[in-house]
Amino acid sequence: MPVVMARDLEETASSSEDEEVISQEDHPCIMWTGGCRRIPVLVFHADAILTKDNNIRVIGERYHLSYKIVRTDSRLVRSILTAHGFHEVHPSSTDYNLMWTGSHLKPFLLRTLSEAQKVNHFPRSYELTRKDRLYKNIIRMQHTHGFKAFHILPQTFLLPAEYAEFCNSYSKDRGPWIVKPVASSRGRGVYLINNPNQISLEENILVSRYINNPLLIDDFKFDVRLYVLVTSYDPLVIYLYEEGLARFATVRYDQGAKNIRNQFMHLTNYSVNKKSGDYVSCDDPEVEDYGNKWSMSAMLRYLKQEGRDTTALMAHVEDLIIKTIISAELAIATACKTFVPHRSSCFELYGFDVLIDATLKPWLLEVNLSPSLACDAPLDLKIKASMISDMFTVVGFVCQDPAQRASTRPIYPTFESSRRNPFQKPQRPLPAQFHSSEPKQRSRPLSASDAEMKNLVGSAREKGPGKLGGSVLGLSMEEIKVLRRVKEENDRRGGFIRIFPTSETWEIYGSYLEHKTSMNYMLATRLFQDRMTADGAPELKIEGLNSKAKLHAALYERKLLSLEVRKRRRRSSRLRAMRPKYPVITQPAEMNVKTETESEEEEEVALDNEDEEQEASQEESAGFLRENQAKDTPSLTTLVENTPKENSVKVREWSKKGERCCKLETQELEPKFNLMQVLQDNGNLSKVQARIAFSTYLQHVQIRLMKDSGGQTFSASWAAKEDEQMELVVRFLKRASNNLQQSLRMVLPSRRLALLERRRILAHQLGDFIIVYNKETEQMAEKKSKKKVEEEEEDGVNMENFQEFIRQASEAELEEVLTFYTQKNKSASVFLGTHSKSSKNNNSYSDSGAKGDHPETVMEEAKMKPPKQQQTTEIHSDKLSRFTTSAEKEAKLVYTSSSSTPFSGPTATLQKIPNTHLSSVTTSDLSPGPGHHSSLSQIPSAIPSMPHQPTILLNTVSASASPSLHPGTQNIPSPAGLPRCRSGSHTIGSFSSFQSAAHIYSQKLSRPSSAKAGSCYLNKHHSGIAKTQQEGEDASLYSKRYNQSMVTAELQRLAEKQAARQYSPSSHINLLTQQVTNLNLATGIINRSSASTPPTLQPIISPSGPTWLVQSDPQAPENHSSPPRSRSLQTGGFAWEGEVENNVYSKATGVVPQHKYHPTAGSYQLHFALQQLEQQKLQSRQLLDQSRARHQAIFGSQTLPNSNLWTMNNGAGCRISSATASGQKPTTLPQKAVPPPSSCASLVPKPPPNHKQVLRRATSQRASKGSSAYAQLNGLQSSLNPAASVPITSSTDPAHTKR
């Protein structure tokens, strides 16, 4: 085959190459030609443009086949050639196999063609395609053979030369006439007249009598486009494609003179009518009789239904085509003899436009040189793609690299090795049926010299029937080549029908041929030797002519197969060719094909009806063929008697070895139980029967997986298809195993493994699934028998018949039954299952040979399995280390994945978080009240081994919590799972302005609304905070840590810097950006410092900012009244709430905002902010003085008892310490600072009109609501500038930050 033939002849023959030759002997794209069948010719497939099959491309690519397109653009031709491995070369290149051009060729180009090169035009084809030349040729034939013999054109005149004759004829009949340019197409320049004065005589035109009685379908005029292929003019060989196009006008036909100018009524050209608003196009290629373009076969079927004689009509059409081409045969054949060096170099596809009148007489309108191959509708693609592919196959492209052609003489395929040693070549391998018994031999093509030298030698041996039709004695080598080429063309004709020469048409039209050469006569006498020697009665000849016409009519009327059907058939044939070869016996082989190609049957179950409809007409035509050729072909009994005795011996031997096959054949003769028929007759299967049928179907799939995993070599397309099938089985096992009541561990094969290994593993896993599935089916049957619920006898079919059907049914039959059962019962849950037990936790998937869990499996487990205490603890202990490296990433996940409704519950939020990190978090009770801190005391016993990593996870989860929660009411989710909050609108503690800011952010910036109040999740590692601190510690720890004078001096200096930045109009917008940066850095320091701190001393960061939690008495009720000292502290932290808001925003979006959010110009917030802008400038200095006085009062009179020290690097190297009081009520400071004028005693929170102004108000308002200890630390942190450090380290070196 071609893959082997491309190698040099000097290669040593090996068994691997012999197997390759044998395996590719029946390649779908190769047909062997020549005297000894040594020349490969490419076979084209129309469906290749859909499949892009590499198996089809490999031949063209191996031989470097090429083409060039000149002066035209045909996308269809380019697509078909490219799909078959051709590559396009430059129009000026001389290395090509095909030149497709849209115009006539120059003589010097024709003379340079080699025998392997082909062009799509003959010289002087304009003798047919120019209207004036066609008219002259027909007139000449009428003068020679009589007017009636060639009356195929309407009465025509060539103007202005015949203007007088036209006027004379018009005076006798004043009907309408049609004017056409002599060299135009697509209806350009065509118009109707009813007076000679309307004609312009400035250029040559053709005037023809208008056929005013056309055949109408639904009152619309139409014509027929026929595709005619001529492969040779000497001898003349004409083919007509079995399918064409019927093109309809868009306006109903009316003979009235008033509509003579309406081209949409009188012209049927597609180029004209597509511009009409009434043009209707059909988008379904299988519907051929709808719209303004039908298939010719659909038109003939319609006429046949109307009682018209379509057989006579198509016989007249063939007569018209043959006479038209014969009229130009002399001129074109003479030009070919003069300019074309090889008889097979040229071919031509003509487009015949034929109009049928009311008497079913066809009239020739015109012949098109290059018929349109545009595919504007699916019907065009189906017809034209099939026609072009069959045309290329008939023409016969020899598989030869065009760059290796010899320049001295015409050649057949030539290879370098053949030219070096043309006389030493191995023999071609024997036919496939002898491979098992005869030695294997290699195949190589002939070189040019070998092909010509062996033509006569090979032809002398071809004297039997089926070769060249008898003896070739007396024929020259050229005549033998021509005879063989014509026979081989007819063997691969596809959808083309040879209408000349045939035994009938030669007798009728042979005398019309004007090119007097011996080739036509030789061809006729050699092709139809039996017909020529038999001098039968005229009645027999007429009967034979009628039978041939009926056969052709049946072929014209049959529906053309669609490209999809062709693709499926070719794929099925490839599967049959890939199966192992068995001894010569048909019956067992067919049974084997059935089992081997069950996957193909599954895909074609729904399309069988379509194929049957399309094959009906083909069977009808085959019936005609059998009837008509019954007299000329031997009978079936004769063929059986003439079969070799070896076959019968092999059949007997095979039957002895395969008694099982014979038993199956005898069983098939018995009437089978048709379960499908029972179901269609309102029968139904029971649940147990449905599961049994489904289990049997799965067993068939398992057997197919195990059987096909043998040591065979399969193609890439087969591997891709099997990979897709295995992927379907894998997906089924993943989902169906979760529906089993019994746990089943599935070890699914990795895609990295080899294909056969994956099939083996998958078959094993499917077998395990079937075993568990059958056990559950048995349990279901036992339960029903115990309960005495006889559903099987009431609803199901007879059990014995059902078991018989199960034993004999194929995979396709079971699939059909299960599909019908599913459609009938509207569900497949009976045999697939719908749910799994909640206690099942052992169904897990592992990918053998792959790293990590399967993503789909993990997601399905996350969706289907609720977290439990054991699983949660295990996962958390395994995955907790990841929190230390991805704290901020998970903080973003919490924000972007949270629920859009407040207090929607942690479950809705945590479903979006990766289960490898947060699968342990469950719902918690969010009810307020002092009794809820009892859950905090349970945490140490639940997680005793996790004292560290407290604040990192806290930053992740607490960022979405409510900032106003009282420490005593914080709820920590535990692995055991706490009850869900009952009320979706429940509020905890007092609200601050943070809720309003978060609400505005969620509305204005389209951020997830998880930042609203009520989404509180805290880390479970802070259980030690619930314990009360020991009282009586020395208060001197605080005085040792802080130097009063240093703090006062530093605070005064930094307060001035803060005022310069915070109260200047230029830095008004960038304030929150600076605070967010400081907050993020401070949070990181808290995380690092907490790692070395005992669990009982670790802080809980308030959601409103990185403050420190004051340990108060757990039983103390909420303090809704704030002392004056607390209020004074809060007024100093007016910018802290904005910092918290931007912290929330930066974590939610992952981007630190460059400026604070500004409301739109039309909102009330903006108007209010503009009014307050001037007031802020006036109040800035007053607020600065108040801040200084407040800070001095704090450090002058503050005494903090029993303190716990905390160190924090805040911003640019700031280290501060704060004390947390515990075991007693917070101490208050005297009120020394006057609150801002805008502060009020009590105000309900609402969306702030301006952030800065409202933050100042909200800060003073919150002072009367929050706890005093809470307020002290908030005020302390808000008053400190990020550039300060205590002890005083005012350096801005980044090293301080990292320390």
UniProtKB/Swiss-Prot annotation:
SUPFAM superfamilies assigned to the protein according to its UniProt record, in alphabetical order: Glutathione synthetase ATP-binding domain-like
GO terms under cellular component: ciliary basal body; cytoplasm; microtubule; nucleus
Boundaries of every TTL domain copy: 62-407
Biased composition (Low complexity): 839-848
Bias (Acidic residues): 598-618
Keywords from the UniProt entry: ATP-binding, Cell projection, Cilium, Cytoplasm, Cytoskeleton, Ligase, Magnesium, Metal-binding, Microtubule, Nucleotide-binding, Nucleus, Transcription
Purpose of the protein: Polyglutamylase which modifies tubulin, generating polyglutamate side chains on the gamma-carboxyl group of specific glutamate residues within the C-terminal tail of tubulin. Preferentially mediates ATP-dependent initiation step of the polyglutamylation reaction over the elongation step. Preferentially modifies the alpha-tubulin tail over a beta-tail. Required for CCSAP localization to both polyglutamylated spindle and cilia microtubules.
Protein name: Tubulin polyglutamylase TTLL5
Organism: Chlorocebus aethiops
